[in-house]
UniProtKB/Swiss-Prot annotation:
Belongs to the DTD family. This is D-aminoacyl-tRNA deacylase. A motif (Gly-cisPro motif, important for rejection of L-amino acids) lies at residues 137-138. It catalyses: glycyl-tRNA(Ala) + H2O = tRNA(Ala) + glycine + H(+); a D-aminoacyl-tRNA + H2O = a tRNA + a D-alpha-amino acid + H(+). Keywords: Cytoplasm, Hydrolase, RNA-binding, tRNA-binding. GO terms for molecular function: D-tyrosyl-tRNA(Tyr) deacylase activity; Gly-tRNA(Ala) deacylase activity; Ser(Gly)-tRNA(Ala) hydrolase activity; tRNA binding. The keyword RNA-binding applies. It comes from Lactobacillus acidophilus (strain ATCC 700396 / NCK56 / N2 / NCFM). The keyword RNA-binding applies. It is found in: Cytoplasm. The gene is dtd. SUPFAM superfamilies: DTD-like (SSF69500). GO terms for cellular component: cytoplasm.
């Protein structure tokens, strides 16, 4: 599993000109599920993200979690995160888990975050989406599990 975590002031995802997900301060998560991932990996990723302290405290240190700042989550599935670019010029996506299992695991991931008390908005699995955001920092982390 690979998750790109972007600290944002706000973010939204549109499909066919209609907003389907919209958050204020929080995390934009771009989520890639790979072959071999299972519920234990999903739970570990959700737990790590829930506890990640990348918001600044009153002293300017990255010491606060998403929960500490009452942040929200926008989760967007993105199989292209699993691209292999080692050979040639065309990325290979054989590492990416195929639907419907990848969709189920992405939905389970979002439920885990909701169960941790977060407001979670999502894109639509497999759709052509337009994602807009205002980075805060920018502060971006790639979580590989």
């Amino acid at each position: 599993m690979r998750v790109v975590i972007q600290r944002v002031n706000h973010a939204q995802v549109d499909i066919d000109g209609k907003t389907v997900g919209n958050i204020g301060k929080g995390f934009l998560l771009l989520v890639g599920i790979k072959n071999g991932d299972d519920l234990s990996v999903i739970k570990k990723a959700a737990d790590k993200i829930a506890k990640m302290r990348i918001f600044e405290d009153e002293e300017g240190k990255t010491n606060l979690s998403l929960k500490d700042v009452n942040g929200e989550i926008l989760s967007v599935s993105q199989f292209t995160l699993m691209a292999n670019t080692k050979k040639g010029n065309r990325p290979s996506f054989v590492e990416a888990m195929r639907p419907p299992m990848s969709k189920e695991l992405w939905e389970d991931f979002n439920k885990e975050l909701e169960n941790d008390g977060f407001h979670v908005e999502t894109g639509e699995f497999g759709a052509d989406m337009k994602v807009s955001l205002e980075n805060d920092g920018p502060f971006t982390i790639v979580l590989d599990l």
